[in-house]
C-alpha cells in the first residue's frame, strides 16, 4: 500500500482550513475527495470527508475492511440505514471513476506507469444567515497542482493548462456546469439546512481560545516569542503581533489554523525579538468566543515551557484524523486547490442522501 508522507498529509489537512472561510453569519457544507494510485499494490485508495462549517460529519475510506460511509458528528446518528447505504454506493462509484481518471490524466501528461499520482476535489455550497443560497464551488487538482475550477458564476470553467482544457471542452459539451449549479443551489442547500438544524448544538457553539505565550532563546542577542491559541471553535481566529503599538505583520511567522483532534482548533504566531526588548511586544487575539480581544505580553516570571502534553495529544489525534480523513484536506491552501480529470458522470440522483452526487469519469 502506498504511503503518503505525514508532512504532506499535514499540509493537506491544514490547507483545508486556510481557505474555507465563510462570510460573516454564513454556513457551508463541503466535501473533500482524495484518490491516490499505488502501482503494483492494488486499487487506488479513495478517501472522502464531509464538513459542515468547521466540523467533520462524515467519512469514507476505501481501505477500510468493509468500506462504508461513517458518521463523524453526533447528530448524524439520526440518519437511517438508507442514508448510509446510498452514500456508500456513491463513494464506491466515485472510487471507480477516479481509478479511470488517474489513467486518463497520466496519458494527458505523458507520464510513466510506475509512478504514484493523486487526484483531489473540493466542492460544496454556502448559505447566508437567512438560509438562502450564497455561492457554490468546485475545484479539482492533480498531483497537488490546480487542474480545473468551476468559476463563481457557476456557468464557466478555468483550466490550469492544456491538459485541463481537454477536460473543460468535454464538460462544456456535456453542460456539466449546468448540472452542478442545479445540485449546489438545490440538493446541497437542502442538506446543509438539515445538518444545521440537526447539529445546531455543535455547530452554533463558540469555544473561546485558551491563550499563553512562550519564550525561546535563539542566540545571545535574540529570542522567539510565540503566541498560542488552543481549544477554540469555530476555526476563524486572528493573531497579530505589535511592537510599541505598531503591527509587525511582515516579521510574523504564522501557521495555518489546525485541528486539535477534539473538534476544536489550534494556532500560533511568532516573532523574533531582541533579547531584553520583549516587553515592547504584544500579541492580540480576536475570536468569536471572546467578549473582547485579548492582549498578551511576555512576563519573565511566567513559565517558558509549552504545554507539551496537550500539544502532543492534539497532534496524535490530528494524525488519526489525517490517516482516516485526511485528505481531502486538499488544497485550498489559500484558494489553490481542487483539481482532477476526465469528465463528469451522474453517480446518483439529485435526492441522494447527503447530496454528494458529484462524480467524474474520464
Curated annotation (Swiss-Prot):
Membrane topology recorded in Swiss-Prot or TrEMBL: Single-pass type I membrane protein
Region (Disordered): 337-362
Gene Ontology CC terms, in alphabetical order: early endosome membrane; ER to Golgi transport vesicle membrane; external side of plasma membrane; extracellular space; lumenal side of endoplasmic reticulum membrane; MHC class I protein complex; phagocytic vesicle membrane; recycling endosome membrane
Region of interest (Alpha-2), residue spans: 115-206
Cytoplasmic side: 333-362
Extracellular face of the membrane: 25-308
Residue positions the entry lists as glycosylated: 110
Occurrences of domain Ig-like C1-type (ranges): 209-295
Alphabetized Gene3D superfamilies for the sequence: Immunoglobulins, MHC class I-like antigen recognition-like
GO BP annotation list: antigen processing and presentation of endogenous peptide antigen via MHC class I via ER pathway, TAP-independent; antigen processing and presentation of endogenous peptide antigen via MHC class Ib; immune response; positive regulation of T cell mediated cytotoxicity
Record-annotated membrane-spanning stretches: 309-332
Residue ranges of the region described as Alpha-1: 25-114
Signal peptide annotation: 1-24
Main location as per UniProt: membrane
Segments for region (Connecting peptide): 299-308
Pfam families: C1-set, MHC_I, MHC_I_C
One GO molecular-function entry: signaling receptor binding
Renumbered residue ranges of the record's region Alpha-3: 207-298
Cellular compartment(s): Membrane
Biased composition range(s): Low complexity: 342-362
Family to which this protein belongs: Belongs to the MHC class I family.
Assembly and interaction partners: Heterodimer of an alpha chain and a beta chain (beta-2-microglobulin).
Protein name: Class I histocompatibility antigen, Gogo-OKO alpha chain
Organism, as annotated: Gorilla gorilla gorilla
Amino acid at each position: 500500500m502506498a504511503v503518503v508522507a505525514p508532512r504532506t498529509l499535514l499540509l493537506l489537512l491544514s490547507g483545508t482550513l486556510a481557505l474555507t472561510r465563510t462570510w460573516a453569519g454564513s454556513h457551508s457544507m463541503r466535501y473533500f475527495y482524495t484518490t491516490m494510485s499505488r502501482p503494483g499494490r492494488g486499487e487506488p485508495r479513495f478517501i472522502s470527508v464531509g464538513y459542515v462549517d468547521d466540523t467533520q460529519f462524515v467519512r469514507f475510506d476505501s481501505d477500510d475492511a468493509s468500506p462504508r460511509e461513517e458518521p463523524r458528528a453526533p447528530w448524524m446518528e439520526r440518519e437511517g440505514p438508507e442514508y448510509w447505504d446510498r452514500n456508500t454506493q456513491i463513494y464506491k462509484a466515485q472510487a471507480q471513476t477516479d481509478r479511470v481518471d488517474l489513467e486518463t490524466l497520466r496519458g494527458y501528461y505523458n507520464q510513466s506507469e510506475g509512478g504514484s499520482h493523486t487526484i483531489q476535489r473540493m466542492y460544496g455550497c454556502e448559505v447566508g444567515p437567512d438560509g438562502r443560497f450564497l455561492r457554490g464551488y468546485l475545484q479539482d487538482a492533480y498531483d497537488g497542482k490546480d487542474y480545473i475550477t468551476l468559476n463563481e458564476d457557476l456557468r464557466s470553467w478555468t483550466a490550469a493548462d492544456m491538459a485541463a482544457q481537454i477536460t473543460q471542452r468535454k464538460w462544456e459539451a456535456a453542460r456539466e456546469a449546468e448540472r452542478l449549479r442545479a445540485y449546489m443551489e438545490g440538493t446541497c442547500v437542502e442538506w446543509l439546512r438539515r445538518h444545521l438544524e440537526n447539529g445546531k448544538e455543535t455547530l452554533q457553539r463558540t469555544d473561546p481560545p485558551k491563550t499563553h505565550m512562550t519564550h525561546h532563546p535563539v542566540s545571545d542577542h535574540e529570542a522567539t516569542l510565540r503566541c498560542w491559541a488552543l481549544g477554540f471553535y469555530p476555526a476563524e481566529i486572528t493573531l497579530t503581533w505589535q511592537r510599541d503599538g505598531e503591527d509587525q505583520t511582515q516579521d510574523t511567522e504564522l501557521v495555518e489554523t489546525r485541528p486539535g483532534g477534539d473538534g476544536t482548533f489550534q494556532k500560533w504566531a511568532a516573532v523574533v525579538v531582541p533579547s531584553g526588548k520583549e516587553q515592547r511586544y504584544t500579541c492580540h487575539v480576536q475570536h468569536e468566543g471572546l467578549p473582547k480581544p485579548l492582549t498578551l505580553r511576555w512576563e519573565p516570571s511566567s513559565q517558558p515551557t509549552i504545554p507539551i502534553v496537550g500539544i502532543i495529544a492534539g497532534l496524535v489525534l490530528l494524525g488519526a484524523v489525517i490517516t482516516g480523513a485526511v485528505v481531502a484536506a486538499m488544497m485550498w491552501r489559500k484558494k489553490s486547490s481542487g483539481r482532477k480529470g476526465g469528465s463528469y458522470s451522474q453517480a446518483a440522483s439529485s435526492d441522494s442522501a447527503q447530496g454528494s452526487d458529484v462524480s467524474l469519469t474520464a
